[in-house]
Amino acid sequence: MIAMSNDDELEEIRKRRLAEIQRQQAQQPSDMQAAYQQEQARAEMEAQKQSILRQILTPEARERLTTLKMSRPALGEQLELQLISLAQSGRLQSQIDDEQLKTLLMRMQPKKRKTSITRV
């Protein structure tokens, strides 16, 4: 009787485990599809952002922005978002050149305190 009960318990555990594995396998394609859709949406947004930046920046300014993004990604991303915001709000009358981009960067960065050491 005890052996029969143990066999039933084992069978029940196997069934639950099999059902759990099947649920995970059924869910996995939807997770992969969701990840794929998110990646597609991110790529599309990035393409739109680059298109806007090509319209509002001169080639020299775009080159500076690319260099900035390689060295300081967070600051580069912040500057891109600010430029796009300016363009979408209609506050840009012409393309931004390298000098104007430098000015924007200077405004964005906090003032650095200069420390000098003098020996006596």
From Swiss-Prot:
This is DNA-binding protein MM_0803. The lineage of its organism: Archaea, Methanobacteriati, Methanobacteriota, Stenosarchaea group, Methanomicrobia. The keyword Cytoplasm does not apply. It holds the Pfam family dsDNA_bind. GO terms for molecular function: DNA binding. InterPro entries: DNA_bind_arc (IPR022889), PDCD5-like (IPR002836), PDCD5-like_sf (IPR036883). One of its GO terms (cellular component) is cytosol. It comes from Methanosarcina mazei (strain ATCC BAA-159 / DSM 3647 / Goe1 / Go1 / JCM 11833 / OCM 88). SUPFAM superfamilies: Double-stranded DNA-binding domain (SSF46950). Belongs to the PDCD5 family. Keywords: DNA-binding. The keyword rRNA-binding does not apply.
